[in-house]
Every structure is written in structure tokens, then in C-alpha cells.
């Protein structure tokens, strides 16, 4: 899988994070990534979800919503993390969560007509209710494993997208376990 094709694909997926009113993920990424570091510590959902990524390049996607793409050049895995205001106006927390889940599924399908959902479930992670959507995609011949994780906390929505080559299901699963603290 070509790094440039994967990066182009991940940048196009940023539209998934446009779940709240005026929040858009117009990519404002600089052309230069940060240097590959030994570790990148990630803290999300008000500190309730923390994980460490090793050997990744970090690219800021949108400072308004805190979007960052972490790219592992060794495995060619991309992880996109975005936080922004939750779509909660006039709704209960449960209704807002359901609206966000439905919107995420719709946006995922709209981003690529070749996306195929393989499973979806709601799980508990560190006291957070988290929606998980797994699937596969074929984007211009690139066969990808996809996982979308979404949670809401303190009027913020957090979305994590994990994209890996279909040839690396073990690495894809390990990346998800790392993020979920399992």
C-alpha cells in the first residue's frame, strides 16, 4: 500500500468528524509531518481515554477541533483522532449519542461507496460508552481494514479512525487493543 495513497484516503475521511453544526474538517494539515518519535501520548475525552502510539508521524489536521493524524510508516497504518462539540442541542445524552452514531454510519458510507460494515457494537471503556464500527473498504484498489470509535464526554465528541492494510489484521487488532486499553 502506498503511503501517499493511504494519506490521501485518510485525509478524505476527515469529513466523518463533521458531526456538529459548523464543525468541519477542512484539512489544514501542513505538508511536513513531525519527526517520527519514540512515543506519542494521546489523551482524549477529558483524560478518560489515554494511550501511547510508538513510531508514528503526527500531522495536525484542524486546530479548531483538535484533529491529528498519526501515521506509522513501518506498518502504513493511519489513526485519525478528532474531538469537537457534541451535537447535543435540545437532546438527552442518550439521544445525542444515538444521533452521533447514526451520523457516523451515514458519513462513513457516504465517504466511500465500497465501505462494508462487518460489525458494530457499543462497549464500555474506562467508564465511557463507546460506539465501535468495524468494516472493510476498497479505495482505488487499496484494500483496507477500518475501525471507527466514537464516544461523548463533557459536551465533546471524540472520534478515532484506525485504517490498516487488509494484509495486517493482527497489527490492526493490536492497534485497537492499545487504544482501548486491552
Describe the function of each predicted region:
Residues 48, 53-57, 156-182:
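Surface-exposed amphipathic alpha-helical segments
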Residues 133, 144-158:
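A short, solvent-exposed beta-edge/loop patch
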Residues 64-145:
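Conserved polar/disulfide-associated segments of primarily extracytoplasmic proteins
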Residues 20-31:
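Signal peptide processing junction and immediate N-terminal pro/mature segment
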Residues 1-13, 17, 21:
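Bacterial N-terminal signal peptides that target proteins for export
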Residues 55, 74-75, 128, 151-157:
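Short, solvent-exposed coil/turn segments at beta-strand boundaries
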Residues 60-63, 140-142, 167-170:
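Solvent-exposed loop/turn segments connecting transmembrane beta-strands
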Residues 29-67:
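N-terminal "mature-domain start" segment
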